[in-house]
Curated annotation (Swiss-Prot):
Alphabetic keyword roster: Lyase, Thiamine pyrophosphate
Gene3D superfamilies per the UniProt record, alphabetical: 3.40.50.920, 3.40.50.970
Membership in a protein family: Belongs to the XFP family.
Protein name as catalogued: Probable phosphoketolase
GO molecular function: aldehyde-lyase activity
The EC number(s) this enzyme carries: 4.1.2.-
Record organism: Nitrosomonas europaea (strain ATCC 19718 / CIP 103999 / KCTC 2705 / NBRC 14298)
């Protein structure tokens, strides 16, 4: 018979098992108990919560892992954070941070005594208390784990440029079936052991999801091993259900994998690295609901999907369930774990690491406390020189790329800035970055490859999920970054944005959570210039999605030209605790504002462009507004036509950069008051508004405004194909000719005076259609149009 390794002494084995039992006891108590936290009297229904909420099934495994990580952190003085992919096992994170003391340090009313334990139990999944997941309220958490799939990308993002940090990342076997998680395994091809830390993936195979078996738990051991070998890992399998045996197996395996991690890093830091090493990982196979009730009402529960949430759920109807719950709680022998005052007994207190080595106190999990300010060049140095508006063209994002290049250069030593994108950095005209840094790449390279190196700082993988997960992990641990993406395909991470915005919303309400750098999106290759890729690439709806979140968390910017984009980029990279969405084109387009004017305009977020207006002597007859670079071009072209043909028509031109200025100041901190809004848009004049996205969003933002009844919005209305740039605006009635027609329709006194102009506009639309169908490009008067002041 083979003798199993015994890395733990009998005393260590007894203590680590007791510590695990303590965490399990506290976890069950959180799910069930209102009172009688140490079972000092027989358990009754009055001691139990009326609504039982929580997830037991994954929790004992999370507790098991946490206890063993504590051992090696304390022994080896490791710098480690814990990422719980199955974040629905929130009781485990609360229990362990309570045992190590960090929870009570942040929440003194949750003291380490009987009263504190009672409060700890009562607050869990209870009105006025805390949620059921690994929420921001839990010290040490950077990953809530409510929506599954992002644990591994968060872990890798956290250790980029953190050479001493290890992220122990527990991946649930249900989560492992998600697309984002499946791709995130490839993050090992982007992890440089010279200047990055390490990720220790721990795949927790407990066999079941909510009501189904998991795929990875039902394939052969050989296939499972080959799968992760194929991903480039060295898997170590730890499996069983006898606690004492499993403690020895887990301890021995952790000793081995930590030695391998140290060896990989030591070799790389001495000799350099050209390809990714084979990092170790652990596959932990334990029963779902381990140590819980074996059966409930005669049905298998431990080791079954039935233990996923609350194994005993009908206590009011079934008194025998109360007896079974008490037996379950007493099976952990709490009298051995806590003294009569409710404190963890002293011998077990020595198992937790000390100070900031406790995973709940690790400063990397409160990244704002470590954040260094970005060194930023003066954005004014990159200004496009403007003598007259609308005379020269520039590629706005290319100008932005030069600015980002120099930000990258200034922060190379501090290693706290990266740019992320799904194979689109060059396409989005940010290629200047490659003047100072390549793309990170540790897989095979070929002689013809360009801009690939192990030490690059541009992160590209064709997975929007992985890009955002990396960036979120990077930001949450105190660094800075930018995510550039095609506008239509940012929808792939709609729900990831949701989760991060929710995290920020809650974090702002927690005094000890320090502000982190904002998550900055650059959305380009946008709807109006996806004429070459066609309908599938045309969708501006991410803005509509973002705007649903809390006003103090989101910002949306639509800079009309390069100088405005420079100002907005600088502003966003300096901001904290926001999600900033910047929408800007990459194609050559007319430029409008010199830098001084751009700063003034963007500081306000909205304003009258006096040089394009002619209502200075009195009230306007019509207000024509625009938001977005292409709508700005079409509005100004329409204004030039109107001023040429109807010189007596008084026109006010308004440009909106900060979309949230349209909302009322009671609803958004950037919003205008009614007085300010009415001063700009009047209380009774027609408003023609050309907007980058779906037009109903403008109505939604302004529906309470005095003059909303006179507001007419043009924007994208799901008409598109592979066609010319100008035809995209025509298909959606947002072109200059339709806008002129809209003005004629809505200014009452024009009437017959504008009949000839209306006919010209309709003829122009026919001429446009005939021309593009014949020549395959826009008419010269469209392609070559420039602003001329009448």
């Amino acid at each position: 018979m083979t003798q199993l390794p015994q890395p733990l002494t009998p005393d260590e084995l007894q203590k680590i098992d007791a510590y695990w039992r303590a965490a399990n006891y506290l976890s069950v108590g959180q799910i069930y108990l209102l009172d009688n936290p140490l079972l000092q009297t027989p358990l009754t229904l009055q001691h139990i919560k009326p609504r039982l909420l929580g997830h037991w099934g994954t929790t004992p495994g999370l507790n098991f892992i946490y206890a063993h990580l504590n051992r090696i952190i304390r022994r080896d003085d490791l710098n480690m954070i814990y990422i719980a992919g199955p974040g629905h096992g929130g009781p485990a994170l609360v229990a362990n941070t309570y045992l190590e003391g960090t929870y009570s340090e942040h929440y003194p009313d949750i003291s380490q005594d009987i009263q504190g334990m009672k409060h700890l139990f009562r607050q869990f999944s209870f009105p006025g208390g805390i949620g059921s997941h690994a929420t921001p309220e839990i010290p040490g958490s950077i990953h809530e784990g409510g929506e599954l799939g992002y644990a591994l990308s968060h872990a890798f993002g956290a250790v980029f440029d953190n050479p001493d940090l290890i992220a122990a990342c527990v991946v649930g076997d249900g989560e492992a079936e998600t697309g984002p998680l499946a791709t995130a395994w490839h993050s090992n091809k982007f992890l440089n052991p010279v200047h990055d830390g390490a990720v220790l993936p721990i795949l927790h195979l407990n066999g079941y999801k909510i009501a189904n078996p998991t795929i990875l738990a039902r394939i052969s051991r050989e296939e499972l091993d080959q799968l992760f070998q194929g991903y480039g890992y060295q898997p170590y399998i730890v499996e069983g259900e006898d606690p004492l045996t499993m403690h020895q197996l887990m301890a021995g395996t952790l000793d081995q994998v930590l030695a391998e991690i140290r060896s990989i890093q030591t070799r790389a830091r001495l000799d350099g690295v050209t390809q990714y090493p084979r990092w170790p990982m652990i596959i932990l196979r334990t029963p779902k609901g381990w140590t819980g009730p074996a059966t409930v009402d005669g049905l298998k529960t431990e080791g079954s999907w039935r233990s996923h949430q609350v194994p005993l759920s009908e206590l009011a109807k079934k008194p025998e369930h109360i007896q079974q719950l008490e037996a379950w709680l007493r099976s952990y022998r709490p009298e051995e774990l806590f003294d009569t005052q409710g404190r963890l007994v002293e011998p077990l207190q020595t198992l937790a690491p000390l100070g900031n080595r406790r995973m709940g106190a690790n400063p990397h999990a409160n990244g704002g406390s470590l954040m260094k300010q970005l060194r930023m060049p003066d954005f004014r140095k990159y200004a496009v020189e403007i003598v007259q508006p609308g005379q020269i063209e520039a590629e706005s994002t290319r100008i932005m790329g030069s600015f980002l290049r120099d930000i990258m250069c200034l922060n190379l030593k501090t290693c706290n800035f990266r740019v992320f994108g799904p194979d689109e950095t060059a396409s989005n005209r940010l290629g200047s970055l490659y003047d100072v840094t390549p793309k990170t790449w540790l897989a095979e390279t070929l002689p013809e490859d360009e801009h690939l190196a192990p030490d690059g700082r541009v992160m590209e993988i064709l997975s929007e999920h992985t890009c955002q997960g990396w960036l979120e992990g990077y930001l949450l641990t105190g660094r800075h970054g930018l995510f550039s993406c095609y506008e239509a395909f940012i929808h792939i991470v709609d729900s990831m944005f949701n989760q991060h915005a929710k995290w920020l919303k809650v974090s702002k309400e927690i005094p000890w959570r320090r502000p982190i750098a904002s998550l900055n999106y650059l959305l380009t290759s946008h709807v109006w210039r996806q004429d070459h890729n066609g309908f599938s690439h045309q969708d501006p709806g991410f803005i509509d999605h973002v705007i649903n979140k809390k006003a103090d968390t989101i910002r949306i910017y639509l800079p009309p030209d390069a100088n405005c984009l420079l100002y907005i980029t600088d502003k966003c990279l300096r901001s904290r605790n926001f999600v900033n969405v910047i929408v800007a084109g990459k194609q050559p387009q007319l430029q409008w504002l010199d830098m001084d004017a751009a700063i003034k305009h963007c500081t306000a977020g909205i304003g009258i462009w006096g040089w394009a207006s002619n209502d200075q002597a009195g009230e306007p007859d019509v207000v024509i507004a625009c938001a977005g670079d292409v709508p700005t071009i079409e509005v100004l072209a329409a204004v030039s036509i109107l001023r040429e043909h109807l010189p007596d028509l008084r026109i006010r031109v308004i440009n909106v950069v900060d979309l949230m200025t349209l909302q009322h100041d009671r609803e958004h901190p950037q919003g205008l008051s009614d007085r300010e809004f009415d001063t700009l848009f009047t209380t009774d004049k027609p408003i023609i508004f050309a907007y980058h996205g779906y037009p109903w969003l403008i109505h939604r933002l302004t529906y309470r405004r005095t003059n909303h009844a006179n507001l007419h919005v043009r924007g994208y209305k799901e008409e598109g194909t592979t066609t010319t740039p100008f035809d995209m605006t025509v298909l959606n009635d947002m072109d200059r000719f339709h806008l002129v027609d809209d003005v004629i329709d809505r200014v009452p006194h024009l009437g017959y005076k504008a009949a000839y102009l209306r006919q010209i506009m309709r003829d122009k639309l026919v001429e446009h259609r005939e021309y593009i169908n014949r020549h395959g490009e826009d008419m010269p008067e469209i392609r070559d149009w420039k602003w001329t002041a009448p």
